[in-house]
């Protein structure tokens, strides 16, 4: 998959992505994931997680405001199902009570992403968005 998907926290005052917990869970769930944090103030996305080992491969970036996470690359044997589950897993690290929107890189297929969303809903979005 080469189309970027974004998970975006809609409300500017609604909290932020739980980076600390996410980092710990990422290391546990996806061993071998590289984490890089840039100190450059010129980059909008300053934390990158990348994994190119066996199993799911991905590249994920978090913006400085901690409100938007971009999945720039995802590949696995059962890509659609695994990608949908990966998106739902990421959603858990945004404030539960806040609206998170899932959108493609062209901003053409926005979808509110509830913490209770079903895998099938995300799979349908992936097909609609052409991701």
PLM regions with names:
Residues 49-131:
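Charged interaction segments
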Residues 1-32, 130-131:
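Short, extreme N-terminal segment that most often corresponds to the first beta-strand
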């Amino acid at each position: 998959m080469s189309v970027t998907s974004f998970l975006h926290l809609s409300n500017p005052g609604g909290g932020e992505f739980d980076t600390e917990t996410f980092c710990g869970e990422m290391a546990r769930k996806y061993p071998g994931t590289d984490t890089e944090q840039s100190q450059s103030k010129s980059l909008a996305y300053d934390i990158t997680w990348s994994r190119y080992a066996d199993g799911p491969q991905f590249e994920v970036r978090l913006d400085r405001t901690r409100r938007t996470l971009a999945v720039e690359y995802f590949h696995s044997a059962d890509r659609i199902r695994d990608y949908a589950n990966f998106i739902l897993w990421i959603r858990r690290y945004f404030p539960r009570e806040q609206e998170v929107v899932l959108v493609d890189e062209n901003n053409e297929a926005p979808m509110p992403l509830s913490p209770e969303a079903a895998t099938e809903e995300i799979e349908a979005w992936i097909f609609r968005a052409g991701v």
